[in-house]
Amino acid sequence: MGSIYSQLFVKLSLPDSSTIKNKTILVTGSNTGLGLEAARHALNLGAGIVILAVRSVLKSEEAKTDITRADPDLMERVLVWPLDLESFASVRAFISRAREYVSNGGRLDGVILNAGIASLAWRVTEDGWERSLQVNVLSTALLALGLLPLLLQASSKDPDSNLSKPHLTILASDIHKTAMFNERHAENILSVLNDKDQWGKSQQAGGATERYAVTKLLDIYITQEIAKLVPLSEDGEPRVVVNCVAPGFCKSNLLSREEGVPVVVKMLQWAVGRSVVEGSKTLIYAVGMGSESHGCWVEDQVVRE
């Protein structure tokens, strides 16, 4: 959620346009909030194609109109693809669509996996998983693994340019530092995380944001493990940069969608939260970072670990 100091005084910047210009950038959860503004930044920085991956195609068409209002000619550079992270079938269909897009002459240069939820109530998806566990972790990992080969294909077209390296950026959060994650001692961690009784115990012990914090911690682990799968080029550098980024505590609708959010959290959000325009700079900046960020956690646009 960011320290009070960084929330108020750290000045965020956009990446050099050369890291985005003419590239194809895909952003999940991009019909509103951080995702929408990250897509807008990409378009303004000269991205050749921006793909809005969204649950509601209708709302995303509205988002498409929004980010191209200043220049309607940009409409043809924005694509809208349906994606529901609460459904593994939807994720697989999305990956298939991306493969078809690339096989037909398209390319994928940057992926920002921004979509996520902060569920404060026990809910199960159609696939039988606790909702935030599936959306923030399982589907995010599945999507990342499915899109990585397509990013590698783009890498093979520009093998010598560090600035042209494809990127896979996962949205994390520094709230992971608060996670108690007592389930880490279990023999089958995912099974325990998917147990309703254990979920209740964890929420009672760690507070209302415990599950969200755990999922964001797991996103960092996902980043580290996927980074290990990336082959190296002849100079020893990764062919695709995989990183995760914290946008800080932002005035997005992540919390407003849920009931039971502690009043103190809402007050902090109002008092020190970054605007989504500002916070989204961290996402698009991460897509322009070099190999030093590979497998790492990025906070306030600085590699932390």
Question: Residue ranges of each PLM-predicted region?
Answer:
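Alpha-helical membrane-targeting segments
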Residues: 1-12, 205, 249-278
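Rossmann-fold NAD(P)H-dependent dehydrogenase/reductase core
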Residues: 3-5, 9-249
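Short connector loops/turns at beta-strand edges and beta->alpha or beta->beta junctions
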Residues: 117-118, 250, 260, 302-303
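Flexible, active-site-adjacent loop/turn segments at secondary-structure boundaries
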Residues: 149, 253, 296
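Feature representing long, continuous alpha-helical segments
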Residues: 220-224, 252, 277, 281
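C-terminal helical subdomain
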Residues: 267-304
